[in-house]
Amino acid sequence: MRRIAVVGAAGRMGKNLIEAVQQTGGAAGLTAAVDRPDSTLVGADAGELAGLGRIGVPLSGDLGKVCEEFDVLIDFTHPSVTLKNIEQCRKARRAMVIGTTGFSADEKLLLAEAAKDIPIVFAANFSVGVNLCLKLLDTAARVLGDEVDIEIIEAHHRHKVDAPSGTALRMGEVVAQALGRDLREVAVYGREGQTGARARETIGFATVRAGDVVGDHTVLFAAEGERVEITHKASSRMTFARGAVRAALWLEGKESGLYDMQDVLGLR
């Protein structure tokens, strides 16, 4: 049995992750759950927090105290928290699955450095469908080339704090790489006022934050007379949770290195 820990266990995504671990039919088991040290829920049973009933795993406020109790840590929290957790796992030689978004370029370098010592799966989105879309986007960009205008539209719930979403940015990176462009140079984030004619090489991003939208992403390839749209819509966070647990199982026996869901799904 793969021993899995969830950090941010008292949050919405944390509860979904706990449920996904417990749905593996014995292939994995939740052996540690961690949240903020000042949480009033520390000591509560993680299964009860997730609505699953008692499973005998108390919520801890200190990752360092439970590092011997798991093989892989799943982290969907905040960059500042994740970076601290990476150092803990690095010292304890524990694998990680990271779904946190909003990292700066420098922070991503720190993550890559840690992956020299431990195996890490890091992805902007753990949905199988989204990762299939990334493969399709690479193909579409290579086929349609410079003959189309490319726009990326994403929508999420009102509580999401980063924009554009990590998934939208990853989609932009895939398209830009396929076309030999640097996303940092061609991305346009929102438009307002007299913007002038659209430059063909740009990749536009539009962001919506409203209600309880779990996650919608559309990449539009628009040419004269036709357009191609590649869309993914998530209706439940469980799709991300199940993907993360799948990644945790896949990591067993893997050497140190930085992997993503394309590796997990065999899409490379």
UniProtKB/Swiss-Prot annotation:
<keyword id="KW-0560">Oxidoreductase</keyword>
<feature type="binding site">
    <location>
        <position position="36"/>
    </location>
    <ligand>
        <name>NADP(+)</name>
    </ligand>
</feature>
<dbReference type="GO" id="GO:0051287">
    <property type="term" value="F:NAD binding"/>
</dbReference>
<comment type="function">
    <text>Catalyzes the conversion of 4-hydroxy-tetrahydrodipicolinate (HTPA) to tetrahydrodipicolinate.</text>
</comment>
<dbReference type="Pfam" id="PF01113">
    <property type="entry name" value="DapB_N"/>
</dbReference>
<feature type="binding site">
    <location>
        <position position="157"/>
    </location>
    <ligand>
        <name>(S)-2,3,4,5-tetrahydrodipicolinate</name>
    </ligand>
</feature>
<dbReference type="GO" id="GO:0005829">
    <property type="term" value="C:cytosol"/>
</dbReference>
<protein>
    <recommendedName>
        <fullName>4-hydroxy-tetrahydrodipicolinate reductase</fullName>
        <ecNumber>1.17.1.8</ecNumber>
    </recommendedName>
</protein>
<dbReference type="GO" id="GO:0009089">
    <property type="term" value="P:lysine biosynthetic process via diaminopimelate"/>
</dbReference>
<keyword id="KW-0220">Diaminopimelate biosynthesis</keyword>
<dbReference type="Pfam" id="PF05173">
    <property type="entry name" value="DapB_C"/>
</dbReference>
<feature type="binding site">
    <location>
        <begin position="123"/>
        <end position="126"/>
    </location>
    <ligand>
        <name>NAD(+)</name>
    </ligand>
</feature>
<feature type="binding site">
    <location>
        <begin position="166"/>
        <end position="167"/>
    </location>
    <ligand>
        <name>(S)-2,3,4,5-tetrahydrodipicolinate</name>
    </ligand>
</feature>
<feature type="binding site">
    <location>
        <begin position="8"/>
        <end position="13"/>
    </location>
    <ligand>
        <name>NAD(+)</name>
    </ligand>
</feature>
<feature type="binding site">
    <location>
        <position position="35"/>
    </location>
    <ligand>
        <name>NAD(+)</name>
    </ligand>
</feature>
<dbReference type="InterPro" id="IPR022663">
    <property type="entry name" value="DapB_C"/>
</dbReference>
<dbReference type="InterPro" id="IPR023940">
    <property type="entry name" value="DHDPR_bac"/>
</dbReference>
<dbReference type="InterPro" id="IPR022664">
    <property type="entry name" value="DapB_N_CS"/>
</dbReference>
<keyword id="KW-0457">Lysine biosynthesis</keyword>
<dbReference type="GO" id="GO:0008839">
    <property type="term" value="F:4-hydroxy-tetrahydrodipicolinate reductase"/>
</dbReference>
<keyword id="KW-0521">NADP</keyword>
<feature type="active site" description="Proton donor">
    <location>
        <position position="160"/>
    </location>
</feature>
<keyword id="KW-0520">NAD</keyword>
<feature type="active site" description="Proton donor/acceptor">
    <location>
        <position position="156"/>
    </location>
</feature>
<feature type="binding site">
    <location>
        <begin position="99"/>
        <end position="101"/>
    </location>
    <ligand>
        <name>NAD(+)</name>
    </ligand>
</feature>
<keyword id="KW-0028">Amino-acid biosynthesis</keyword>
<dbReference type="GO" id="GO:0050661">
    <property type="term" value="F:NADP binding"/>
</dbReference>
<keyword id="KW-0963">Cytoplasm</keyword>
<dbReference type="InterPro" id="IPR036291">
    <property type="entry name" value="NAD(P)-bd_dom_sf"/>
</dbReference>
<comment type="pathway">
    <text>Amino-acid biosynthesis; L-lysine biosynthesis via DAP pathway; (S)-tetrahydrodipicolinate from L-aspartate: step 4/4.</text>
</comment>
<comment type="similarity">
    <text>Belongs to the DapB family.</text>
</comment>
<dbReference type="GO" id="GO:0019877">
    <property type="term" value="P:diaminopimelate biosynthetic process"/>
</dbReference>
<dbReference type="GO" id="GO:0016726">
    <property type="term" value="F:oxidoreductase activity, acting on CH or CH2 groups, NAD or NADP as acceptor"/>
</dbReference>
<dbReference type="InterPro" id="IPR000846">
    <property type="entry name" value="DapB_N"/>
</dbReference>
